[in-house]
Curated annotation (Swiss-Prot):
Belongs to the bacterial ribosomal protein bL34 family. The gene is rpmH. The keyword Transcription regulation does not apply. This is Large ribosomal subunit protein bL34. Residues 1-44 are annotated as: Disordered. GO terms for biological process: translation. Residues 1-22, 31-44 have a biased composition (Basic residues). It comes from Alkaliphilus oremlandii (strain OhILAs). InterPro entries: Ribosomal_bL34 (IPR000271), Ribosomal_bL34_CS (IPR020939). Keywords: Ribonucleoprotein, Ribosomal protein.
Length: 44
């Protein structure tokens, strides 16, 4: 059986990347929350 996680850099950044997060208001809220929490990495 094939594993479910087949990593792809392009797809990951397209779906969970910084620019995708910035493009929506809820995405910006996520970034804000992660900044407040003090996350080292904001996005994938």
């Amino acid at each position: 059986m094939k594993r479910t996680y087949q990593p792809k850099k392009r797809q990951r950044s397209k779906e969970h990347g910084f620019r995708k997060r910035m493009s929506t208001s809820t995405g910006r809220n996520i970034l804000k929350a992660r900044r407040l929490k003090g996350r080292k990495r904001l996005t994938a």
